[in-house]
């Protein structure tokens, strides 16, 4: 088997859709028994003062946009999902909306997350930003 260079791997990833990359990451995590999630410090209940929790929330710089439900205007939500998530075809966007709750965007800036949430809610979807 030929060894691929880093540039060749990146070129292959650029050609993949978001769903294909997500499946790849899951299989990679399972194969090598690792996780791509950032480590999170878990404090015991009541151990940290309330002010510390507020400071931690203010320091958060990456947010996930999660589609909770499509609502009554499913077609409009599908159109917005295609607009927000680059590289999605109509079928992939429909599958994503049908499979709610699903993350649409991961580790994006607060402004991008808020903008996506506003567009989705305007289309009739229920969305959370974490």
From Swiss-Prot:
GO terms for molecular function: mRNA binding; structural constituent of ribosome. Gene3D superfamilies: 3.30.1390.10, Single helix bin. Homodimer. Part of the ribosomal stalk of the 50S ribosomal subunit. Forms a multimeric L10(L12)X complex, where L10 forms an elongated spine to which 2 to 4 L12 dimers bind in a sequential fashion. Binds GTP-bound translation factors. One of its GO terms (cellular component) is peptidoglycan-based cell wall. CDD domains: Ribosomal_L7_L12. GO terms for biological process: translation. Belongs to the bacterial ribosomal protein bL12 family. The gene is rplL. It comes from the Bacteria. Forms part of the ribosomal stalk which helps the ribosome interact with GTP-bound translation factors. Is thus essential for accurate translation. Keywords: Ribonucleoprotein, Ribosomal protein. Was identified as a high-confidence drug target. This is Large ribosomal subunit protein bL12. Disulfide bonds: none annotated.
């Amino acid at each position: 088997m030929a060894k691929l260079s880093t540039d060749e791997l990146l070129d292959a990833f650029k050609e993949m859709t978001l769903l294909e990359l997500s499946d790849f990451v899951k299989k990679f995590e399972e194969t090598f028994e690792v996780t791509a999630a950032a480590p999170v410090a878990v404090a015991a209940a009541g151990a940290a003062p309330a002010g510390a929790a507020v400071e931690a929330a203010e320091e958060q710089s990456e947010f996930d946009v999660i589609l909770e439900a499509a609502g009554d205007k499913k077609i409009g939500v599908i159109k917005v999902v295609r607009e927000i998530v680059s590289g999605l075809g109509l079928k992939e966007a429909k599958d994503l909306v049908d499979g709610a709750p699903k993350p649409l965007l991961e580790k994006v800036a607060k402004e991008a997350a808020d903008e996506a949430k506003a567009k989705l809610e305007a289309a009739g979807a229920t969305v959370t930003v974490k």
